[in-house]
């Protein structure tokens, strides 16, 4: 059976797709329309393309080796234990976004059950997926596979019903509210929407369980990118061309769904579309965010006790730590905007380190370049990685211009704390980075 041999391409695609299609498509499109009006769908297409540029180094890297500890494995191998530790801690803190996923899910469930408390429900659903992930990757992958098909049916029904309802009069291309915020507004929308266009690269965390990681991980990322380019563009086009942009901006997909679907189908869409989308992302997030920590424990950044596993091979202390991180925004009632802003900035800092490591790995990891599955040239490799690095830096600069000083200060202080922790842990001779990748 497949679980004995490892995860095949099909399951990796469903995991990657389920991870990337989540709170973003169902919650952020309306926010993006506040910046750019009815051109929100075009901003989504651009965000997917820019996102592919940013994650392209990982596609190349994954074709050369099995990465057992997520991106942390090669960052520490190439840049050293200090920078590897900073990457791992920064990446793990993106787990704060699970609070966003829970709140987004709660807003949709409230449309079906108006009496629920959104924040309490969000806490319950994060807890549910925490417990589910304690039973191992195989169960998680099976659940993800089912949710994937439910998600596709839900979003495609939204697209089909939307195009059936659309008329030439409702199409806004060329109208005053198209590019409503000008070039700056459009760019701000692209940067915001990128929060939901790069998550397919997180499938790297499942390299250890993949049957043929050097081929299937890159293909899963590319296939998923193609899927979301088409799906996000279509969903966005429907969302921006049924009702006036002023009625949809700042709202979620339910506003348009209620307009284009009969009552019974509207409720089925809520379950198969937005709710399934957020379910798939939350389901895979525990493994994705805990995988670097698992390897960091083995390398000595944290006490060995934290790496203990249960009978399903799950590091339950680390999964619990990720659970606590995800619950913090819910317990302290952080705003969704603050969660997104902080997550984007912390992730961007971590990804700069990861891209620099990719650029240097052919010289630092002996035999890796010769071992690549896809035989691209070094010139092409350098062009792609440098373009990704420059794009990521430009995005950080643009993001900082739109963030509040408080978010920037909190992020910088967090990174400094991570750096100090790593410094004293290494100085105390606790850290001994082990090889956590395999050349096959």
Model-derived regions: residue spans:
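Helix-loop-helix junctions that connect adjacent transmembrane segments
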Residues: 2-3, 117, 145-267
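Membrane-interface loop-to-helix entry segments
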Residues: 118-168, 180-181, 198, 221-226, ...
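A generic transmembrane alpha-helix motif of multi-pass inner-membrane proteins
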Residues: 345-347, 377-440
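TM-loop-TM module centered on a large, flexible mid-protein loop between adjacent transmembrane helices
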Residues: 73-75, 80, 111-113, 222-283, ...
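Membrane-interface "cap" regions at the ends of multi-pass membrane proteins
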Residues: 1-39, 51-56, 68, 173, ...
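Helix-loop-helix connectors at the membrane interface of multi-pass transporters/channels
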Residues: 2, 74-78, 102-122, 154, ...
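Hydrophobic transmembrane alpha-helices that form the core helical bundles
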Residues: 31-35, 43, 53-134, 139, ...
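Transmembrane alpha-helical segments of multi-pass small-molecule transport proteins
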Residues: 11-13, 45-46, 87, 112-139, ...
